[in-house]
Amino acid sequence: MFNPAILVLADGSTFYGKSIGYQAVSAYSIGEVVFNTAMTGYQEILTDPSYAKQIVTLTYPHIGNTGTNDEDNESNQIYASGLIIRDLPLLHSNFRATSSLSDYLIQHNIIAIADIDTRRLTRILRETGSQAGCIYIPNENESLAQAVEKAQDLAKSFGSMAGKDLAKEVTCQHRYEWQEGIWHLPTNNAGKPFNLQTTPTFHVVAYDFGIKQNILRMLAERGCKITVVPAQTSAEDILALNPDGIFLSNGPGDPEPCTYAIQSIRQLLNTQKPIFGICLGHQLLGLAVGAKTRKMAFGHHGANHPVQDLKTEHVLITSQNHGFEIDEYSLPENVIVTHRSLFDNSVQGIELTNQVAFSFQGHPEANPGPQDVAYLFDKFINAVQATKA
């Protein structure tokens, strides 16, 4: 039995639906409401730390068809503050499924709403930009008008993502090592779905600003021993680990308040060790070389974003998840733009001309989405190999 639920945006836009997650009356969740156009991958989206403090609207109408499983998580918990969908199927079916989407949300105490007009909501967000919002489960002692007013007040209390340093909130507390490679279908019941890299060739230190596990798997699959370190790790501590290369991960929030990371990256750039950044790591690399970042109106969230590699002129379909971008006109002379969005011409990749350091705004590791940009991992490994030789 699903309880009634409402979604109210900070501007007062109101939607009525049913609660498909955590069911307690008077429960609520607040965050920045964004929309994602991916047709699949809802479990990966929910567990992506980049969605911390965000309520995710999935524009594809049928969500939950394949249930959830124990292998598709991108972290050890759900980081999205809430989920908004149009229709939740009554049945789920997939040979890997261990739970329904609703049961998965309830298990993790995540508030979610279904049966609302997600097309109307998406149009509002496109026209006004991302807004704070609140999913609220009314109680029987309050009128609907009272519930809406309360939810709007809660939404307004969230404020803006600008100025929020969320990397410190989602990062690991202690460094750890990673050896697990990419997923594959086991050939028998005793097989393991993930390869273990037992004879690594390179040592990469990865900053965890909210790192997705498939990024680590892509590096491990290419022969890397990965040491994952907390976001506030100093450059001196990084160098003490004697890495062959340095990776700057994805993550949530505004990059500008992450001054600790920007300072460390600046120092690491002086070492000539290869550096590769993704998403938030891309923005932090830009800030470290003197560029500026800015908040986007509604960001890029989806698995079908066309991006052009300016060197090869190839068009790549990419997975995207970010609400901030590098201001191209603030880039210094020693930085070139390598990739550009074909949706809005925003900067999607940069590279330093005087050392081995480059980054990409989207997600070459996908999960969910295409792997057209996975070659950037190979580029990083080739740079590590050349530097080590």
UniProtKB/Swiss-Prot annotation:
Q: Report the domain of life of the source organism.
A: Bacteria
| Its job | Small subunit of the glutamine-dependent carbamoyl phosphate synthetase (CPSase). CPSase catalyzes the formation of carbamoyl phosphate from the ammonia moiety of glutamine, carbonate, and phosphate donated by ATP, constituting the first step of 2 biosynthetic pathways, one leading to arginine and/or urea and the other to pyrimidine nucleotides. The small subunit (glutamine amidotransferase) binds and cleaves glutamine to supply the large subunit with the substrate ammonia.
Residues involved in L-glutamine binding: S50, G251, G253, L280, Q283, N321, G323, F324
Protein name per the record: Carbamoyl phosphate synthase small chain
Question: Per the record, what are the reactions this protein catalyses?
Answer: hydrogencarbonate + L-glutamine + 2 ATP + H2O = carbamoyl phosphate + L-glutamate + 2 ADP + phosphate + 2 H(+)
Residues forming the Glutamine amidotransferase type-1 domain are 203-389
| UniProt-listed GO biological process terms | 'de novo' pyrimidine nucleobase biosynthetic process; 'de novo' UMP biosynthetic process; glutamine metabolic process; L-arginine biosynthetic process
